[in-house]
């Protein structure tokens, strides 16, 4: 149990979103640390599941192989495998809570000469539990959230850790423990403090995001000044922390209590910026001539995006491809009956999107039950001209490479992409459920 937080075990794994909004609204996060480590998040998830009896409704060690919707039966047939044996389950609805990472393989990147390297090459997604990197020289290739998390945690034991990045990222330091949150917990009732803290963490990131998008140059200078103040004199902002894009064109990296910058100032960590020319038996050489000696190379170059967890999806035996279809109100998929994807936000805590999705699905189920409907299918109306838009409005490398795997958003109507939790929550609770939606009455067979 725990998904990413159980499967990913690299050193220092933690959230890069605050747990006050990343956690469940019905079971508020109570720890003092707003950015939590993987083990704490895993424990929190298990406690929530036990407290509300969710764990008693989970079939563990079951792998979903395929899911087929039958128009005749008005239900799904799901093929699963457990202990080497296959069986089927039937249900009216499917909620795809599989995340959006490929947990079988990482994102493939071309690193020239990597096959020449005689040391260990490790992807953070598949970190060996028995890896001893004490007094080793480690090169971490990448500049995203995983690399920023790894650097200070590896530097504690390694002889030297060098971050090798093709292009820089914005890194923002935040307090590990929020003093204002602690004051609220000290002087206010628990329920009130939890609500106020959650609202604070809902509003401040949203305001900052909109400032970044409205005043990009101001935001860029602001964040760069913050990074410059934290960097040691030996490391300059340019070129190592001078991205070619403005804040929130790609997701910002965060580090708790300056741990990333402190590791750079300790002398145990360093940073090299430039394209890799080649990898030798024991080093990385950049096009600018820098040589990074290494016993271990960590390829923190991004994650491969995948929806549906490798399950084959079909409607009446006809294969269904996520990438060929539009997303209805961020929840359901065009032409796919009684099914939803749990999708979050690039500019806020992912689980806020899951919360909005859950609200929408519960409301849809009640609407169908009260009207005696057996199926709901989002439809693009005949003659409706939609212009495709990206589901995630970021230009990060792993997002760009995933365009062929993600469904599409549209430019109008219920097909527009999600951007704002408050808007989506209102739509989920009060919005129109019938717009571009075909409902099938119980007892009426119909080809879908």
Identify what each model region corresponds to.
Residues 97-236, 269, 292, 343-393:
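Rossmann-like dinucleotide-binding core of oxidoreductases
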Residues 29-50, 59, 141, 211-220, ...:
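Short beta-strand to alpha-helix junction loop
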Residues 64, 88-102, 138-141, 161, ...:
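Short hydrophobic core segments
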Residues 1-58, 165-166, 230-235:
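Beta1-alpha1 glycine-rich phosphate/pyrophosphate-binding loop at the start
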Residues 229-293:
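Alpha/beta-hydrolase fold catalytic core
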């Amino acid at each position: 149990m725990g998904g990413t937080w159980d499967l990913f075990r690299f050193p220092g794994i933690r959230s890069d979103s605050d747990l006050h909004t990343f956690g469940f609204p019905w079971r508020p996060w109570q720890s003092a640390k707003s950015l939590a480590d993987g083990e704490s998040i895993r424990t929190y998830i298990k406690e929530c599941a036990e407290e509300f009896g969710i764990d008693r409704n989970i079939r563990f060690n079951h792998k979903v192989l395929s899911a087929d919707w039958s128009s005749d039966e008005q239900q799904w047939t799901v093929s699963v495998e457990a202990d080497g044996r296959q069986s089927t389950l039937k249900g009216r609805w499917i909620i795809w809570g599989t995340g959006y990472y490929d947990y079988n393989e990482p994102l493939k990147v071309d690193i020239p000469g990597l096959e020449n390297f005689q040391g260990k090459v490790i992807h953070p997604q598949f970190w060996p539990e028995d890896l001893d990197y004490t007094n080793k020289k480690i090169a971490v290739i990448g500049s995203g959230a995983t690399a920023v998390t790894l650097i200070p945690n590896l530097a504690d034991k390694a002889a030297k850790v060098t971050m090798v990045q093709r292009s820089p990222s914005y890194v923002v330091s935040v307090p590990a423990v929020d003093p204002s949150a602690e004051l609220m917990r000290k002087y206010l009732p628990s329920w009130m403090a939890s609500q106020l803290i959650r609202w604070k963490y809902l509003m401040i990131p949203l305001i900052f995001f909109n400032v970044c998008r409205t005043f990009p140059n101001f935001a860029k200078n602001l964040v760069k000044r913050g990074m410059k103040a934290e960097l040691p004199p030996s490391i300059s902002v340019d070129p190592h922390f001078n991205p070619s894009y403005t804040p929130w064109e790609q997701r910002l990296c965060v580090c708790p209590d300056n741990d990333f910058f402190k590791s750079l100032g300790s002398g145990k960590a360093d940073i090299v910026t430039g394209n890799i020319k080649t990898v030798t038996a024991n080093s990385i050489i950049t096009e600018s001539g820098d040589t990074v000696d290494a016993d271990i190379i960590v390829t923190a170059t991004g994650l491969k995006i995948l929806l549906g967890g490798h399950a084959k999806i079909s409607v009446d035996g006809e294969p269904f491809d996520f990438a060929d279809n539009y997303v209805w109100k961020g929840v359901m998929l065009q032409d796919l009956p009684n099914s939803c994807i749990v999708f979050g936000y690039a500019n806020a805590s992912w689980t806020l999107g899951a919360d909005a999705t859950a609200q929408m699905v519960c409301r849809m189920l009640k609407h169908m039950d009260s009207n005696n409907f057996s199926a709901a299918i989002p439809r693009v109306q005949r003659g409706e001209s939609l212009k495709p838009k990206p589901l995630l409005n970021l230009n990060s490398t792993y997002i760009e490479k995933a365009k062929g795997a993600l469904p599409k958003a549209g430019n109008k109507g219920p097909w527009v992409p999600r951007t704002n939790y408050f808007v989506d929550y209102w739509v989920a609770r009060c919005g129109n459920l019938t717009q571009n939606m075909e409902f099938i009455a119980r007892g009426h067979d119909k080809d879908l």
